[in-house]
């Protein structure tokens, strides 16, 4: 009896551990977090030259951690005046080149990732931030793209190479290129992200305020996913209660 009881307990423990593993595996594969890819085209000379060469609508790519694009990173010029003083930067859509050029056209893409991938993205970006002074712009890599030959140098990136590198290192499956060959157009034609806005960058936050609800903390709620479903459920309950009170 004791042996049978012990065997049953062992089976229960094994079954419990198996269920926990299944739950953890499901959590690791569920895409519950978002990052954002901003594709843009300003009226600067480098942007116009790139557009003329590529014949593509966008010449620059950035990676953001929030829908308002408040925390956003890329490789670009560090100041407004000197186009050759470039490196890893934190971008602001209301300052710098974006703030100066109110006619900047853009495309905002939302990419759902797993919690584990999101954690890795944050870790990679933190490394970039800590070593910011080491990074330069991969000018030679741009010519490599023209020749279809990836030129990847440590601490040197161009904008779309940087975005691809971060996502790729975090385990996000993309379009099977080397980071040194990634172009803004690749993100535009990639079918994984959702298009949430296309138009003038200057009007983007106004668009958000008119089309996205906010939670009690003043943060925009995604229009798909668990948070938005919960928001809609809460709104439905409130509407039912209001209707009942009026009857």
Predicted segment positions?
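Cysteine-nucleophile amide-bond enzymes
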Residues: 2-247
């Amino acid at each position: 009896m004791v042996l049978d009881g012990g065997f049953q307990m062992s089976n229960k423990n094994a079954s419990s551990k198996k269920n926990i593993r299944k739950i953890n595996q499901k959590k690791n594969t569920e895409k519950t977090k978002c990052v954002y890819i901003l594709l843009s085209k300003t009226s600067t000379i480098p942007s116009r030259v790139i557009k003329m060469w590529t014949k593509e609508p966008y010449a620059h790519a950035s990676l953001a951690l929030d829908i308002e694009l408040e925390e956003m990173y890329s490789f670009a010029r560090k100041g407004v005046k000197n186009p050759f003083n470039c490196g890893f930067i934190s971008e602001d859509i209301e300052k710098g080149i974006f703030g100066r050029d109110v006619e900047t056209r853009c495309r905002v893409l939302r990419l759902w990732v797993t919690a584990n991938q999101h954690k890795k993205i944050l870790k990679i970006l933190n490394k970039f931030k800590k070593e910011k002074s080491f990074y330069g712009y991969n000018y030679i890599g741009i010519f490599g793209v023209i020749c279809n030959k990836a030129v990847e140098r440590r601490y040197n990136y161009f904008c779309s190479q940087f975005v691809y590198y971060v996502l790729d290192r975090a385990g996000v499956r993309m379009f099977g290129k080397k980071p040194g060959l990634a172009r803004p157009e690749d993100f535009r034609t990639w079918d994984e992200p959702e298009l949430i806005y296309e138009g003038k960058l200057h009007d983007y936050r106004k668009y958000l305020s008119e089309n996205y609800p906010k939670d009690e903390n003043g943060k925009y709620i995604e229009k798909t996913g668990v948070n938005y479903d919960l928001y809609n459920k809460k709104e439905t309950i409130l509407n039912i209660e209001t209707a009942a009170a009026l009857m």
